[in-house]
Amino acid sequence: MAASALRGLPVAGGGESSESEDDGWEIGYLDRTSQKLKGLLPIEEKKEKFKKAMTIGDVSLVQELLDSGISVDSTFQYGWTPLMYAASVANAELVRVLLDRGANASFEKDKQSILITACSAHGSEEQILKCVELLLSRNADPNVACRRLMTPIMYAARDGHTQVVALLVAHGAEVNTQDENGYTALTWAARQGHKNIVLKLLELGANKMLQTKDGKMPSEIAKRNKHHEIFNLLSFTLNPLEGKLQQLTKEDTICKILTTDSDREKDHIFSSYTAFGDLEVFLHGLGLEHMTDILKERDITLRHLLTMREDEFTKNGITSKDQQKILAALKELQVEEIQFGELSEETKLEISGDEFLNFLLKLNKQCGHLITAVQNVITELPVNSQKITLEWASPQNFTSVCEELVNNVEDLSEKVCKLKDLIQKLQNERESDPTHIQLREEVSTWNSRILKRTAITICGFGFLLFICKLTFQRK
């Protein structure tokens, strides 16, 4: 029974199989009847017991066998050492014991280091973090790459271990190293959708402009894998956190990146950090940290902030000076928008929510520009025909064009109202669908607000054109 329960444990050597019954890591029942091992067992039998003790994680028996003369750096089948196996299963207690007995933390087998093995281990991040800390404390090199030129930080970023990434960088790991395909740690994090790691790597100086072998940047990799939030984050031309911690000493960097979580063991410290959200990243980059608490209290998201009007800025207590900083930053925002000419007459069913929202935002923005332009013309238009110094064509031509504009605006208003009704219908159907997972309320509320603004803007534009038409008729 015990033997069958233990057969599912990982096998050293990356899961390789062997037809031999003696594969070096056989899992079975361990006879503990004789604990007086010094000098009583042949060396081969001691090695066999040592392998089994390692496999089941029996720390006390491992220590006893080491005391009996077993080498701490003995190699088994596949050439793995006990320390490499302990790291592969994220057994921090075994790793500590073996290191204390003098195990080589810099051992490599087939271009795979023990540190890489720990970073790619199957286990909780807490246990992996412990193992990595122990190995780094024994001078394991965080920049040694495997055969695919992947370094430990790439494995940690790929597997979503945020604290491990931070710890590796604090001990000198290169952030912008590229593997055989041109992937960096940032590219791996973007590919797998690990937003917190993306934010931390940006803070640590990751270069988001580095391209893969096929010419893709991390933002494009994120978009290709449908991680739209990370795509938008990486699309900022301005990287507000880039290089923020690069000039600090190793000790200062550790203090900045890591804060003590708890001392659950007497002589070991766990580490954690609080990641910036999108809103914090944006505000810190502009030197507007003082606005963070105010905006969070009012449940204002980054997307909401970036689409605010002047009256909303004032209403939410944002000063004119801060408004100018935000508006200037908007010009630096490279959000991929749908061009009007790119839309075919057929509905693009594959359009994403972010792309559709960008379309509505751009439509609303263009309508706002048109309203401003017409208002400027109305303001500058002479109220008396005698003040017109240049030769004009018949006013009838102008009023005719204005009538067409009014008709077009009315048609546009009708279409937008239909679009709003259609979206509302879809929303109602999704809410009534028992299999649908409800999205956050702020998202749907904000989309509805955008549609309302667009409709109001178009109606206002039509009203201005109507006034313009009356002005020409009066003249």
UniProtKB/Swiss-Prot annotation:
Start and end residues of each SAM domain: 272-334
> What does the entry give for GO biological process?
cell differentiation; male meiotic nuclear division; regulatory ncRNA-mediated gene silencing; spermatogenesis; transposable element silencing
Instruction: Recite the UniProt keywords alphabetically.
Output: ANK repeat, Cytoplasm, Developmental protein, Differentiation, Meiosis, Phosphoprotein, Repeat, RNA-mediated gene silencing, Spermatogenesis
What do the Gene Ontology cellular component annotations say?
Answer: pi-body
Task: Say which domain of life the source belongs to.
Answer: Eukaryota
InterPro entries xref list = Ankyrin_rpt, Ankyrin_rpt-contain_sf, Asz1_SAM, SAM, SAM/pointed_sf
| ANK repeat windows | 45-74, 78-107, 110-144, 148-177, 181-210, 214-243
Region listing for Disordered, in residue ranges: 1-25
Q: What is its quaternary makeup?
A: Interacts with DDX4, PIWIL1, RANBP9 and TDRD1.
Q: What is this protein called?
A: Ankyrin repeat, SAM and basic leucine zipper domain-containing protein 1
Q: Which species is this record about?
A: Pan troglodytes
